[in-house]
Amino acid sequence: VRDRKTAAEALASLPDEWKAIDILINNAGLVIGVDKEHEGNLDEWDIVIDTNIKSLLAMTRLVVPGMVARGRGHIINIGSIAGDAAYAGGSVYCATKAAVKALSDGLRIDLVDTPLRVTNIKPGLVETNFSVVRFRGDKDKADNVYKGIRPLTGDDIAETVYFAASVPEYMQIAEMLVMPTYQATGTIVSRN
């Protein structure tokens, strides 16, 4: 989704019966490394920013006009608890997820006179390949992130997406923070 042209071509190649998208889930997101802001790799940050912010903007721009024209639709952006407060070694990632919140809020304002809904789901610790990418393939470091806790799974987040999409059309869940029971904030976690 980082390549706008490819994304547009993929949407154009959908069968006719799938082109009228009712629910857009902007779920692309990653982070590479744990570098300090003044020591980070600018090329890696370009990838993070392109994936976490620009792809969300591109998909929204490509899909939402059709929703507006049809008078129905739901945009669900997957943000992160990291968008609420920065943490050591994650300033750029945290900034991109804060941008997801701002973009979600702004889109909701832009669409206030339509029946479209906008939701920002902000997961806490979810065990996916996210940490493997963050630690540049170091599986041991990635596994340590989840050591001593029961993290959420991708299926758990899918349940929250389903819930947000299933509420009656006269209501919208603007924002949902979802985390494991033993997580209090982005950085405060109780481990066994």
Locate the predicted segments by residue.
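C-terminal helical subdomain
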Residues: 120-121, 140-187
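Active-site helix of classical SDR
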Residues: 60, 96
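Alpha-helical segment proximal to the catalytic Tyr-Lys
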Residues: 65, 109-112
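The beta1-alpha1 cofactor-binding region of Rossmann-like NAD(H)/NADP(H)-dependent oxidoreductases
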Residues: 1-9, 42
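Substrate-binding pocket helix/loop in short-chain dehydrogenase/reductase
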Residues: 35-37, 41-49
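Active-site loop immediately N-terminal to the catalytic Tyr-X3-Lys motif
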Residues: 87-91
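Residue(s) in the substrate-gating loop at a strand-loop-helix junction
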Residues: 80
